[in-house]
């Protein structure tokens, strides 16, 4: 619970049998998570049994792909604040508080893994992936004149329930480049968002995408083509996010009250 709102964490799993139980328990251990929803996307044998040892709720998405699993999770989660994360141990559960702090002011809070000081030794964020994610994010920032962006592929993201449903109902990408589509749909809908740095740790096991350089390049190219298609269809002048509902500029007292909720 955060500020009187239920918090759901959505994990999409395919090859994370050895880490998913610890990740689920880590999020419940933060004390602010009311629900962990796991979308089993044809996961490896034994994964469902590991999930069953926890308090998490499990749903099954037979259509293979990150986008299909994410869409299912956004629609199924019961919380008023919905946080997407990975079950592979790369994210710190306590970093959820960084996202929640901004949820009072923004309908979407996006994590970024490209802050050098928060990339842990051994994390799968070598120069190619780091600068590739940064470059594609900057392409979006420039083409759509958005707020600051530095990571197109970070799963660690928070959405209010309405924003989550709006994204899910308009998603078309079922594959690994769906993260870029989610970001683009957030932007073109005029959703107020902000990006915050999160820790990025070594993965437990091998990623089916970023663990193979050629696949990572292919996903990057798919993202760029998707961005260009969105830009061609989008209006010349993008909708501005709604103004904050404050009758005065935020003060240190306001920030203190938010943190204490």
List PLM regions with ranges:
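Hydrophobic helical membrane-anchoring modules
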Residues: 1-7, 18, 146, 170-261
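Short loop->beta transition adjacent to catalytic acidic/histidine clusters or analogous donor-positioning motifs
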Residues: 4-7, 27-38, 56-57
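Short, well-formed alpha-helical segments that are part of the catalytic scaffolds
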Residues: 15-29
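Donor nucleotide-sugar binding loop of glycosyltransferases
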Residues: 16-19, 43, 66
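A conserved acidic beta->alpha catalytic loop
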Residues: 40-48
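Acidic donor-binding/catalytic loop of UDP-sugar-dependent glycosyltransferases
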Residues: 45-46, 85-102
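Acceptor/aglycone-binding surface of glycosyltransferases and processive sugar-polymer synthases
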Residues: 62-64, 68-76, 94-172, 203-213, ...
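Short aromatic/hydrophobic "clamp" motif used to bind/position activated sugar donors
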Residues: 82
């Amino acid at each position: 619970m955060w500020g009187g709102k239920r918090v759901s964490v959505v994990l999409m799993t395919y090859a994370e049998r050895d880490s998913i139980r610890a990740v689920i328990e880590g999020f419940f251990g933060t004390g602010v998570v009311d629900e962990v929803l796991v979308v089993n996307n044809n996961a490896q044998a034994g994964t469902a049994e590991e999930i069953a040892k926890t308090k998490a709720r499990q749903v099954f998405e037979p259509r293979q792909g990150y986008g299909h699993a994410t869409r299912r999770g956004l629609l199924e989660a019961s919380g008023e604040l919905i946080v997407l994360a990975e079950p592979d141990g790369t994210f710190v559960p306590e970093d959820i508080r960084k996202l929640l702090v901004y949820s009072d002011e923004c309908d979407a809070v996006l994590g970024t893994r490209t802050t050098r000081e928060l990339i842990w030794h051994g994390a799968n964020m070598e120069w190619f992936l780091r600068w590739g994610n940064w470059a594609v994010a900057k392409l979006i920032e420039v083409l759509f004149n958005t707020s600051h962006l530095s990571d197109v592929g970070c799963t660690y993201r928070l959405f209010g329930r309405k924003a989550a449903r709006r994204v899910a109902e308009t998603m078309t990408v079922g594959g690994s480049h769906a993260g870029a589509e989610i970001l683009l749909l957030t932007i073109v809908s005029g959703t107020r968002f902000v990006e915050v740095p999160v820790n990025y740790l070594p993965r437990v096991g091998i990623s089916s995408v970023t663990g193979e350089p050629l696949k990572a390049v292919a996903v990057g190219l798919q993202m760029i083509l998707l961005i260009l298609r969105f830009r061609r269809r989008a209006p010349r002048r993008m909708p501005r996010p709604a103004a904050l509902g404050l009758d005065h500029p935020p003060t240190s007292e306001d920030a203190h009250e938010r943190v204490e909720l």
